[in-house]
Design a protein with these regions (language model features):
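Positions within the helices of HEAT/ARM-like alpha-solenoid repeats
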Residues: 278, 297, 310-313
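Amphipathic alpha-helical scaffolding segments comprising HEAT/armadillo-like alpha-solenoid repeats
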Residues: 260-264, 293-305, 325-333
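Iron-sulfur cluster-binding cysteine motifs and their immediate structural context
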Residues: 172-195, 215-239, 300
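Alpha-helical adaptor scaffolds
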Residues: 243-276, 283
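Auxiliary alpha/beta "docking" domains used to position bulky ligands
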Residues: 1-166
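Structural detector for internal amphipathic alpha-helices that build alpha-solenoid repeat scaffolds
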Residues: 279-292, 314-326
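Long C-terminal interaction/binding lobes of large macromolecular proteins
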Residues: 1-6, 47, 310-315, 319-333
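Short coil turns that connect the paired helices of HEAT/ARM alpha-solenoid repeats
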Residues: 199, 269-274, 303-312, 333
């Protein structure tokens, strides 16, 4: 944990405006929607004096087994979304906030909330430094953490910060990005970032569909490549939650109704809870990793090629062409 003042996050505000002006936001909302608000703790809690920041690890001590090939096409989920990693952090922060309120101060907990740029307050509080992949890296631990804050009218002594840079000349995360989304150290072009592409509504640009590979939600490549996160992250592992979904049966998902998807993957961010976007992603995954000879694959693709939703029909047609291309390398797609 760390503590910082409730002053405006000037550098973060400038970065949000600059990147939005350059179109690097990729049309996302979140903290980009209103930078003046998301970079000013006083807009979240009037008369705030301090921000308490906490980081909770989500790297597991044991990784789930990769599904066997005969299990059918499975889609990969980013680590932070295997379960709702923010729920236990939110509970802990609210408990601390409650204790602060008992001393007649205002205190509000925020986690996975657009009210404040958590990464920026964590940086100023000295929890870590910005990696070239734009993640916050904690000294001796890496980036496998989710962040949350308490904004309060109580005044606490700030912890020393920011932490000194620990990346040096390393560019492994930049080299590892499958779409070249890290356009400069610490600068992400969200238009190319697979994590955002898989959340963004609309048709997935053709040039990124093959690069998506077997991913349905999230992408960990820039973190998996980070030597600090890989080497030191295991010091801060948690037990694997029995509810963890690291892999999704793509055909099962495509056959399922919305309420089933919502019940199982409701902690995912899905625009307007329109699960067509999750199905769209699953179709791309099947095109990339499905067995062209599997009758279950052929059935679900043909079903979606005739779908009333033009987005799903178009992605199913692409998947069919991709399966044909993989089955007969060199064939026209």
């Amino acid at each position: 944990m760390g503590v910082t003042t409730a002053d405006v996050l000037v550098e973060a505000r400038s970065a949000l405006y600059d990147r939005r002006a350059q179109g690097l936001d990729g049309g996302m909302g979140f903290t980009y929607r209103n930078p003046d608000r998301s970079t000013d703790p006083l807009r979240a809690v009037a008369a705030a004096r301090s921000v308490i920041v906490a980081a909770r690890p989500y790297l597991t001590d044991i990784d789930p087994d990769v599904p066997l090939p005969d299990a059918g096409p499975h889609a990969r989920v980013g680590r932070y979304a295997w379960v709702d990693q923010y729920a236990p952090l939110r509970v802990a922060l609210r408990d601390v906030a409650k204790r602060i309120r008992r001393a007649d101060h205002r205190a509000v907990a925020f986690a996975d909330d657009n009210s404040i740029v958590d990464r920026a307050v964590a940086h100023r509080a000295g929890l870590g430094w910005y990696g070239k992949n734009a993640n916050l890296l904690l000294p001796g631990a890496g980036s496998w953490f989710v962040l949350g804050s308490i904004i309060t009218t109580a005044e606490y002594e700030p912890t020393p910060g920011p932490a000194p840079d620990g990346c040096g000349s390393c560019v492994r995360c930049i080299d590892a990005c499958p779409t070249g989304a890290i356009v400069a150290p610490g600068v992400i072009d969200a238009n190319r970032c697979i994590s955002w592409i898989l959340q963004k509504p609309g048709s997935i640009p053709d040039e990124y569909r093959v690069a998506i590979g077997d991913r349905i939600y999230g992408c960990d490549d820039c973190q998996d490549a980070c030597p600090i996160s890989v080497r030191l992250g295991r010091r801060n592992t948690i037990e694997l939650d029995e509810r963890a979904d690291a892999w999704v049966d793509a055909i099962e998902l495509l056959d399922a109704p919305d309420d089933w998807i919502d019940a199982r993957y409701g902690h995912w961010y899905v625009t307007n809870r329109e699960f067509r976007w999750v199905r769209r992603n699953a179709l791309v995954v099947i095109g990339n990793v499905g067995d062209p000879a599997d009758p279950r694959v052929r059935r679900v693709i043909e079903h979606y090629r005739a779908h009333i939703d033009p987005i799903l029909a178009e992605h199913a047609t692409w998947a069919a062409d991709r399966l044909r291309e993989r089955s007969h390398p060199g064939a026209a797609s």
